């Protein structure tokens, strides 16, 4: 099972917000997921990004791969190098 840490799109048309989830890479983007570990709202100023750093470290240690977008958000927060 290839596990990814990725964004799940929520909200309305032209007004998205995202949940940061751990999901099998074979599942649809907005489909089933294993665990929700945070939220990301790019619309508000300043941008809101809340995430449970301990859960991120646990999942990465267990082999989960963050997507490029999530990886850049985690680097900005200083959670990963």
From Swiss-Prot:
One of its GO terms (cellular component) is small ribosomal subunit. GO terms for biological process: translation. Transmembrane segments: none annotated. Belongs to the bacterial ribosomal protein bS16 family. GO terms for molecular function: structural constituent of ribosome. Keywords: Ribonucleoprotein, Ribosomal protein. This is Small ribosomal subunit protein bS16. Coiled coil: none annotated. PANTHER family: 30S RIBOSOMAL PROTEIN S16, SMALL RIBOSOMAL SUBUNIT PROTEIN BS16M. It comes from the Bacteria. It comes from Ruminiclostridium cellulolyticum (strain ATCC 35319 / DSM 5812 / JCM 6584 / H10) (Clostridium cellulolyticum). The gene is rpsP. Disulfide bonds: none annotated. Pfam families: Ribosomal_S16.
């Amino acid at each position: 099972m290839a596990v990814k840490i990725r964004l799940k799109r929520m909200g309305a048309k032209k007004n998205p917000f995202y949940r940061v989830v751990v999901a099998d890479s074979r599942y649809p983007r907005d489909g089933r997921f294993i665990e929700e570990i945070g939220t990301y709202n790019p619309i508000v100023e300043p941008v809101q990004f809340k995430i449970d750093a301990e859960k991120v470290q646990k999942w990465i240690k267990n082999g989960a791969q963050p997507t490029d977008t999530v990886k850049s958000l985690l680097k900005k927060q200083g959670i990963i190098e």
